[in-house]
UniProtKB/Swiss-Prot annotation:
Residues 428-440 have a biased composition (Pro residues). Residues 188-197, 494-513 have a biased composition (Polar residues). It comes from the Eukaryota. The lineage of its organism: Eukaryota, Metazoa, Chordata, Craniata, Vertebrata. The gene is LDB3. May function as an adapter in striated muscle to couple protein kinase C-mediated signaling via its LIM domains to the cytoskeleton. It is found in: Cytoplasm, Perinuclear region; Cell projection, Pseudopodium; Cytoplasm, Cytoskeleton; Cytoplasm, Myofibril, Sarcomere, Z line. GO terms for biological process: actin cytoskeleton organization; heart development; muscle structure development; sarcomere organization. Residues 86-197, 284-440, 472-529 are annotated as: Disordered. Residues 1-84 form the PDZ domain. Keywords: Cardiomyopathy, Cell projection, Cytoplasm, Cytoskeleton, Disease variant, LIM domain, Metal-binding, Methylation, Myofibrillar myopathy, Phosphoprotein, Repeat, Zinc. GO terms for cellular component: adherens junction; cytoskeleton; filamentous actin; perinuclear region of cytoplasm; pseudopodium; stress fiber; Z disc. Residues 549-607, 608-667, 668-727 form the LIM zinc-binding domain. This is LIM domain-binding protein 3. It holds the Pfam family LIM.
Length: 727
């Protein structure tokens, strides 16, 4: 429902906005100041602002709406729409009028809850004696809502009083207890009592139970039964034999001794599923998840006992299978009824069992001893050995050294069929990967084949090496020697001392570093300083001598006279023009695009045109103004000197050097005689141009920019020195 409100100005208006187009939500009133103009105009919080001074707010941002309200001249007209927000529902439950008793130690018995007087308390003779139970006298005093028995009261009779009740016992006397047994209250009172809480901490039943327990403590002190000092009896332990936890404890205690030991061994050796997956990834899954028979066999051999067990851990095994004697009576006791439990507690029996059923699994934890864990670990390795154990020298055949020739050298299949086939016997390989990988690969790769196998660089970079290099690796890696892998090479190889004598060196190493023949001469040659494009060069003749250079064209040794050009040597008959094949021995040539040309061919095909004389440029070329010039054609229009690599200025389409351009065309300052360059501040006065810092008084040198001045003999003067005679 829309409605319009007009607020009389001026501001403040007394409301706050929220939302807008930039917040992707409509403009709403978020807050109204109490007593303000907005509150007096019946604006409600949460109403939607549809229009401000007749302007729709659908396209307004939050800032635009604020500015629109601020710009209101005198009155502010708002078109609002009632919020569709539902009425908040209270989440708290309505208060329940329940009758609560009067608190005896905080309420005067002569006053009611609302302060009205009640009947006076009866005489002390009418009160109940300490020996009689106070329950019949309390029942007609309280309302029916509190007269019914509850489970809390029955349990409170059998429970041990806590510290609050002990403090009550210390502070009250027997006479005070008799007063508590007969409190005064209005019968049938239904008004709520003061200082109470939902759990009934100060209810009548709680006070009655406290008084009854205090009476029982006094009777126990008088009869001499119970603990010394008149304290309350200790509660007997109530065992719920029907609970699943109790049944599981009894079942674990009644297990036979061998089954308990077997469970302890399995719990100490088995691993979780994540450890089994990790073992499969690392290749050690043969050690995981053993069956029960293997575990039983691992603990039965006698030869492992003296190695792994100790005197401190041996007595733990027989003791772990026996349940504690103190826990067995409580475990076998039948469930007690509720009435029997109260009777046993009322008699103040102190013969409760010393241990609870929760202590029964404790000896099971001691069944795991280092003896079992240590003896089962080595037995796991021996239980999986199917057949005779492989000796230490045998695994030497399964090494990287025996497999390398098949990867690097394409030796025929007949070479590997006789000897390595016999060495790859299933004895060390088939049982498990453990015995095959026990020797480290480092000592297996150090025997004599390592220094003798010295291939040339060609097989290392080509997938198929030359056939003449095959015999060397095949001899070095043919078969596996029967010697153990742990023995050093100077023991297994008889010629080790001759090979590695201090004064000897192998020739195979020199073959690796030195090539068989000289490398092919590439046309690159030594680096020559680069020349400018189009530079005319000439070859230099050299007579025959002891020097034997290589020709830059045919890459052959030159016998006899030769030419030297562009940093290389040439046969005289092979140093020709790339186009007309004319010999360049006695004529000039030009290098262009990695080729040499005679002057005539270069002028015809490659030489650029000069922009001034319109002829071919042979030699150094000047590039300026996006054109090519002879160095002698591109000169200053005033002094006719070539520019070279210096700066020049253009004026009326002609180039000028910097000196002539300043003298001819630049504006000079009349004060300092220096040119006024572009970007400099200048002043035009007295028919001349001045720098802004040069237009000063000729006498006192005060800057006259923007100031009145006088002139005398074409020089500016300030007002103070205007009548100066001598200048």
């Amino acid at each position: 429902m829309s409605y319009s409100v007009t607020l009389t100005g001026p501001g403040p208006w007394g409301f706050r906005l929220q939302g807008g187009k930039d917040f992707n939500m409509p403009l709403t009133i978020s807050r109204i100041t109490p007593g303000s103009k907005a509150a007096q105009s019946q604006l409600s919080q949460g109403d939607l602002v549809v229009a401000i001074d007749g302007v729709n707010t659908d396209t307004m941002t939050h800032l635009e709406a604020q500015n629109k309200i601020k710009s209101a001249s005198y009155n502010l007209s708002l078109t609002l729409q009632k919020s569709k927000r539902p009425i908040p529902i209270s989440t708290t439950a309505p208060p329940v009028q329940t009758p609560l008793p009067v608190i005896p130690h905080q309420k005067d018995p002569a006053l009611d809850t609302n302060g009205s007087l009640v009947a006076p308390s009866p005489s002390p003779e009418a009160r109940a004696s300490p020996g009689t139970p106070g329950t019949p006298e309390l029942r007609p005093t309280f309302s029916p809502a509190f007269s019914r028995p509850s489970a809390f009261s029955s349990l409170a009779e059998a429970s041990d009083p806590g510290p609050p009740r002990a403090s009550l016992r210390a502070k009250t006397s027997p006479e005070g207890a008799r007063d508590l047994l007969g409190p005064k209250a209005l019968p049938g009172s239904s008004q709520p009592r003061q200082y109470n809480n939902p759990i009934g901490l100060y209810s009548a039943e709680t006070l009655r139970e406290m008084a009854q327990m205090y009476q029982m403590s006094l009777r126990g002190k008088a009869s001499g039964v119970g603990l010394p000092g008149g304290s309350l009896p200790i509660k007997d332990l109530a065992v719920d034999s029907a609970s699943p936890v109790y049944q599981a404890v009894i079942k674990s205690q009644n297990k036979p001794e061998d089954e308990a030991d077997e469970w302890a061994r399995r719990s100490s050796n088995l691993q979780s599923r994540s450890f089994r997956i990790l073992a499969q990834m690392t290749g050690t899954e043969f050690m995981q998840d053993p069956d029960e028979e293997a575990l039983r066999r691992s603990s039965t051999p006698i030869e492992h006992a003296p190695v792994c067990t100790s005197q401190a851990t041996t007595p733990l095994l027989p003791a772990s299978a026996q349940p504690p004697a103190a826990a067995s009576p409580s475990a076998a006791s039948p469930p007690l009824a509720t009435a029997a439990a109260h009777t046993a507690i009322a008699s103040a029996s102190t013969t409760a069992p010393a241990s609870s059923p929760a202590d029964s699994p404790r000896p099971q934890a001691s069944s795991y001893s280092p003896a079992v864990a240590a003896s089962s670990a080595p037995a796991t390795h021996t239980s999986y050995s199917e057949g005779p154990a492989a000796p230490a020298p045998k695994p030497r055949v399964v090494t990287t050294a025996s497999i390398r020739p098949s990867v690097y050298q394409p030796v025929p299949a007949s070479t590997y069929s006789p000897s390595p086939g016999a060495n790859y016997s299933p004895t060390p390989y088939t049982p498990s990967p453990a015995p095959a990988y026990t020797p480290s690969p480092a000592p297996a790769y150090t025997p004599s084949p390592v220094p003798t196998y010295t291939p040339s660089p060609a097989p290392a970079y080509t997938p198929s090496p030359a056939p003449n290099y095959n015999p060397a690796p095949s001899v070095a890696y043919s078969g596996g020697p029967a010697e153990p892998a742990s023995r050093p090479p100077w023991v297994t190889d008889d010629s080790f001392s001759q090979k590695f004598a201090p004064g000897k060196s192998t020739t195979s190493i020199s073959k690796q570093t030195l090539p068989r023949g000289g490398p092919a001469y590439t046309p690159a040659g030594p680096q020559v300083p680069p020349l400018a494009r189009g530079t005319v060069q000439r070859a230099e003749r050299f007579p025959a001598s002891s020097r034997t250079p290589l020709c830059g064209h045919c890459n052959n040794v030159i016998r006899g006279p030769f030419l030297v050009a562009m940093g290389r040597s040439w046969h005289p008959e092979e140093f020709t023009c790339a186009y007309c094949k004319t010999s360049l021995a006695d004529v000039c040539f030009v290098e262009e695009q990695n080729n040499v040309y005679c002057e005539r061919c270069y002028e015809q095909f490659f030489a650029p045109l000069c922009a001034k004389c319109n002829t071919k440029i042979m030699g150094e070329v000047m590039h300026a103004l996006r054109q090519t010039w002879h160095t002698t054609c591109f000169v200053c229009a005033a002094c006719k000197k070539p520019f070279g690599n210096s700066l020049f200025h253009m004026e009326d389409g002609e180039p000028y050097c910097e000196k002539d351009y300043i003298n001819l065309f630049s504006t000079k300052c009349h004060g300092c005689d220096f040119p006024v360059e572009a970007g400099d501040k200048f002043i035009e006065a007295l028919g001349h141009t001045w720098h802004d810092t040069c237009f000063i008084c000729a006498v006192c040198h005060v800057n006259l920019e923007g100031q009145p001045f006088y002139s005398k003999k074409d020089r500016p003067l300030c007002k103070k020195h205007a009548h100066t005679i001598n200048l």
